[in-house]
Swiss-Prot record:
Positions on the Cytoplasmic side per record topology: 1-30
Recorded consequence of changing residue 393 to L: Reduces transport of inosine and guanosine. Moderately reduces sensitivity to formycin B. Causes relocalization of the protein from cell membrane to flagellar membrane
Annotated phenotype, changing residue 189 to T: Reduces transport of inosine and guanosine. Reduces affinity for inosine and guanosine. No significant effects on sensitivity to formycin B. No significant effects on protein localization to cell membrane
Transmembrane segments: 31-51, 112-132, 133-153, 179-199, 212-232, 350-370, 378-398, 406-426, 428-448, 475-495
Location, primary (coarse class): membrane
Known outcome of mutating residue 393 to K: Slightly reduces inosine and guanosine transport. Moderately reduces sensitivity to formycin B. No significant effects on protein localization to cell membrane
A family per Pfam: Nucleoside_tran
Gene this protein is translated from: NT2
Glycosylation sites: 326
Localization, UniProt: Cell membrane; Cell projection, Cilium, Flagellum
Protein's UniProt name: Nucleoside transporter 2
Family: Belongs to the SLC29A/ENT transporter (TC 2.A.57) family.
Catalytic activity: inosine(in) + H(+)(in) = inosine(out) + H(+)(out); guanosine(in) + H(+)(in) = guanosine(out) + H(+)(out); xanthosine(in) + H(+)(in) = xanthosine(out) + H(+)(out)
Effect of residue 389 to N: Abolishes transport of inosine and guanosine. Significantly reduces sensitivity to formycin B. No significant effects on protein localization to cell membrane. No significant effect on inosine and guanosine transport
Amino acid sequence: MTGQSAAVEGSNSALPWYRMGFHTLAEFNTYVTFVLLGMSIMMVTSAVTSAPDFVTKYFIYATGDPDAVAETPLFWNNANTFYNAGTYAMQVVTEIASLTPFMRSIPLGIRLFLGLGIPFVELVVIIAVPAATIPTQNGAIAVIMVVAMMGGLSKALCDSCTNALVGPFPTKFMNGAQWGLTVIALFMSIIQIILQVSMGSTFQDVLTISRIYFGIGIGIQVMAIAALVLLRYNPFAQKYIAEFRAAALRRRGHVEPEESQDSKEPATGDVAEAPKAGEKEVTLDAMEEADEVRAVPSDAFVAKSGAVLQATGDADRMVDLDQTKNITSTEQMLRASVWSVFKRIYPMLLCAFTIFFTTLLVFPGVFFLVPARSGWYMTIIVTLFNAGDFVARVLLMIRVLRPSPKLVIVGTFGRLAVIPLIVLCVRGFIPGVALPYVLIFLFGLTNGYFGTMSCIHCPRTPTLHYAGERSVAAMLAGISLMLGLCFGSNMSLAITLTY
């Protein structure tokens, strides 16, 4: 390390973001933006799931009748499961469509801003209907399902675009987006508990709580949109997001001819800083991801089936060869072969599907079937799951605690041991709520730990060499996750309806 670089490091060490592993404020702001985007993906779903009593009794508030009795108990007793099924069904269809050439040709910014805007309509509808009231409970059912379908569309747009944006970034940024998914869930659960404790449980109190609760959700969406707007002008983000980099070049009037986007071959080049010959690498910490990039040997470009399991090296030290000048993100993705990417990462895609399938298979539906006398049972179950998920994703911020792809496979099937135990609780063979509380925390912990890493290993594998491939890999991970959630929630619906 030279005297000059040591002096720079010494002057930066006092900065708060440097102590957290970020070398510049722009880098830290990029990380925060991805956390907010992750939060926005799950914001409405987390808000609805964290207020199970409000949803299952929505017909009371929507009709304005405190004494109303459910006319369709089959739906209202399983309202959360119906909501999840509708949301995930719509989401998986939209996410699959996002891989088509037509959808990939639409700029990421346009799709993402649309996805961030839809939740405003969802939350306003949820709040406005009880304020205006509707005459029938069937109308309340329609509101729940319309909000679910809109939520699925919004989540798909936000999820696929966020994955495409974060895929080329170093691993810690994708972990930040994944962390945001659980931060919002835990945050909304805590807010719901605070509101329930601090306010009453009368008809009017619940309406007031819902307005405060969902109003907070609207505020979070505003923050995410503002952060995304600023991200377009962030020099660190422009280094990895081709669309933002090309826009910056156009603003400066530096538009250079680029290859036609019809080209099937990835562009080559390097806009990220690489070390000069003979220069030693300088890292902030031995365990921290390096921001510098490295070229890869030519013999590593063979697309082998399941290569993610045998991959060696560190993707964060590799150069993405299509990060060139004014190429856009859509051009990068159109040049990537979806099938070639799928072949290399399919073991992690299967893990993502299995983990989230089993999660939605028993949570929240089957856990809610446990005979419990406490009116707090459902709220505590949701909070404990979110807490376990949150803790797991925090642990993954520490590099040495991240499991390898092979360990992810072991964890994926090991967590299935929770299912027979919760079935025994539902059937009454194991009485009380103590064991369900322990099981749901462990289920959330393994969901966050192995589920997150299965998604991270998809784009952040050394077997991929282009930013377009990493974006597609991250989108495939999102689709596998959504397929698991969709099939799991629908299977859970079938179980709870026949119980």
